[in-house]
Amino acid sequence: MHKTISVELNDASINSAVKELQRYAKWVSQKEAELVTRLAQIGATVASIQFSRAIYNGSNDVSVRVDQTGSVAVIYAEGSSVAFIEFGSGAKYGYGHPDAGKHGFGPGTWSDGPEGKGHWDNEKGWWFGSGQHSYGNPPAMAMWKAVQEMTEQITRIAREVFGT
């Protein structure tokens, strides 16, 4: 939004301009928080949907929430299966997440003990829990897709919020 403030060189005009700038700063701050809220809602919705649709043999205990303070929002994915679902697992399905390596995740990177890593690449899959068999699962990329969607939507939403 383009804003023009005219000022004359006298006390009353300068005081008026200061008040106008303070109102404008408050408006920008409110709009910034609104933009962040809308983007976070989109991101959380996409992540929730992707996690809920994930192919995963274990217990999908993922929940997604947003914490927002002013113009900062953080989208959290919580649960013991988050990394397995987000990044995938196993030699058959565990590849394909574009950011797995950046975060130290991917096939063969997790173990629940010294013997755990020995089975991730078994072509026959592996057994876990109480007799459950798995070949792994493909990466759902729920958080990654949330970022992609927010990136795609930011210009449109900013124009709506700021009225430009």
Question: What do these predicted regions represent?
Answer:
Residues 1-82, 95, 99-164:
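Short, Lys/Arg-rich flexible segments
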Residues 86:
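His/Glu-rich zincin catalytic helix
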